[in-house]
């Protein structure tokens, strides 16, 4: 059984029309934002990268209900503008689907730095970590993850290089950053770990 695992499944509403993101090995890839409602009523605004052949089979317009399966990917942004680590969902399947919102991810990888346990101003425990999930051909995705409460305490006991296998959801979070006296709003994307699991629980 392959130890590394990365599978995300999303169902939500397209916020915008797909725009060309980049071309790789002659294949064009497009980017759009998928809005996925939480139970609280707040929505996660998640960037999706989709190959052109999938878009030709299933065109996407703003307001369309969309179901996606794929992988959560990271890209090291060396332009000096925006986030240094760019996180997006790479779509491997794409269909029209207006059913209930869905947001879940299954990951198995290794911790590439020591988990950091801290308390929020309201006294709730939270643990930050970076999970490295290997792809084929020697590449890896470095995925920011957070855990809360009892799960935060549990994963904080792990050390760099330890394997973490977990189920969670992908979330967006808006924060403010001040540079040279100018404050701007930015959006971070991360995995909220719901529970550690056994690898045998994952869909194949």
Which residues make up each language-model segment?
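Single-stranded nucleic acid-binding surfaces, predominantly the OB-fold ssDNA-binding core
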Residues: 1-204
């Amino acid at each position: 059984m392959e130890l590394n695992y990365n599978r995300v499944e999303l169902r939500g509403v397209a916020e915008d029309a797909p725009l060309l993101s980049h071309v790789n090995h002659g294949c064009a890839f497009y980017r759009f934002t998928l809005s996925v409602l939480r139970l609280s009523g707040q929505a996660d605004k998640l960037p999706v990268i989709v190959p052109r052949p999938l878009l030709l089979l299933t065109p996407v317009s703003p307001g369309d209900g969309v179901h996606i399966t794929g992988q959560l990917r990271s890209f090291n942004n060396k332009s000096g503008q925006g986030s240094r680590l760019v996180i997006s969902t790479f779509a491997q399947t794409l269909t029209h689907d207006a059913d209930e919102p869905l947001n879940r991810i299954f990951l198995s990888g290794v911790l590439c730095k020591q988990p950091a346990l801290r308390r929020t101003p309201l006294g709730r425990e939270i643990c930050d970590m970076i999970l490295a999930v290997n792809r084929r051909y020697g590449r890896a995705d470095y995925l920011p993850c957070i855990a809360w409460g009892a799960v935060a305490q549990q994963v904080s006991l792990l050390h760099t290089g330890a394997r973490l296998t977990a189920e969670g959801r992908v979330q967006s979070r808006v924060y403010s950053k001040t540079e040279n006296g100018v404050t701007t709003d930015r959006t971070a994307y991360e995995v909220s770990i719901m529970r550690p699991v056994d690898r045998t629980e994952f869909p194949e």
